Amino acid sequence: MKALSKLKPEEGIWMVDAPKPEMGHNDLLIKIRKTAICGTDIHIYNWDEWSQKTIPVPMVVGHEYVGEVIDMGIEVRGFDVGDRVSGEGHITCGHCRNCRGGRTHLCRNTSGVGVNRDGAFAEYLVIPAFNAFKIPDDISDDLASIFDPFGNAVHTALSFDLVGEDVLITGAGPIGIMAAAVCRHVGARHVVITDVNEYRLELANKMGATRAVNVAKESLEGVMEELGMTEGFDVGLEMSGVPSAFHSMLDTMNHGGKIAMLGIPGGEMAIDWSKVIFKGLILKGIYGREMFETWYKMASLIQSGLDISPIITHHFKIDDFQQGFDAMRSGQSGKVILNWD
């Protein structure tokens, strides 16, 4: 089968002829229709320090996808051949305390599809049936293929009550932009998103942000004054991993504010903890999606009218995958879809 593999420990991704994956008794065999390129895939492509420590070589990469069930193990229940599915990319152990307590997104033994084991950038994928999520008929393949990162946005945004609240999002990558759309959809008052990438900030405007702020050109405090905000942000969503962005968030949070953190800093990050203490801030780390509550919320948000389609800016046939990676690496894109049909 065709597959995109991290074939060598150097920059790049390569098209290979890989063996079709073998299916176990509790697995689904999925024929891939569409995949999306994630920021993680760009880290793997670039072969940065994290990738060198984490990624086995060679390995088929990719974890954002939609496909069709074409076969299943003899123990599988609840799925049929022909079902359209996406899937949770974190394969959990099932026996640690968090798994047994129903907090599977906090499994200490998680194995990542396309990170620790062969992934979805291939004509076929095998995953445990437990990890698959049926896609409702009224949700398109394009949207289903980005459910993984959309789930990061939903999990982060819905960590705290948003109705009537003022929200600051630092980092206008695709996940931050989708989080802005979620916040507005569920009833936040002002949703302000910051970055220095004008292309991404314009996308954020299209997706419903109250204000998309280029912090290289204007001050966050000035924007707050413009919006009539006198007490600071109630909720912060840190999506960038950039220390200066987080420092700005701490400075502009209201007392008693709540911060959900998804962005991963490149190294240790010093902060002024006195601001956290004296403002009584609550910090929550976010990893992945809640299994599977986030997935049901994603489908329901779209079915209730949330439109995240503007975040998809590029489509390429799989044979043109290099153009897709080039678009993502340029920073002048939203989500990039690779078509396998």
Swiss-Prot record:
What keywords are annotated for this sequence in UniProt?
Cytoplasm, Metal-binding, NAD, Oxidoreductase, Zinc
**Where is the protein localized?**
Cytoplasm
Cofactor note text: Binds 2 Zn(2+) ions per subunit.
User: Which BP terms in the Gene Ontology apply to this protein?
Assistant: L-threonine catabolic process to glycine
Q: In which pathway does it act?
A: Amino-acid degradation; L-threonine degradation via oxydo-reductase pathway; glycine from L-threonine: step 1/2
Give the enzyme class: oxidoreductase
Q: Which InterPro entries match?
A: ADH-like_C, ADH-like_N, ADH_Zn_CS, GroES-like_sf, L-Threonine_3-DHase, NAD(P)-bd_dom_sf, PKS_ER, Zn_alcohol_dh
Q: What does this protein do?
A: Catalyzes the NAD(+)-dependent oxidation of L-threonine to 2-amino-3-ketobutyrate.
User: Which PANTHER family would you find in this protein's record?
Assistant: L-THREONINE 3-DEHYDROGENASE
Q: What is this protein called?
A: L-threonine 3-dehydrogenase
Organism per entry: Shewanella sediminis (strain HAW-EB3)
The UniProt gene name for this protein comes to tdh
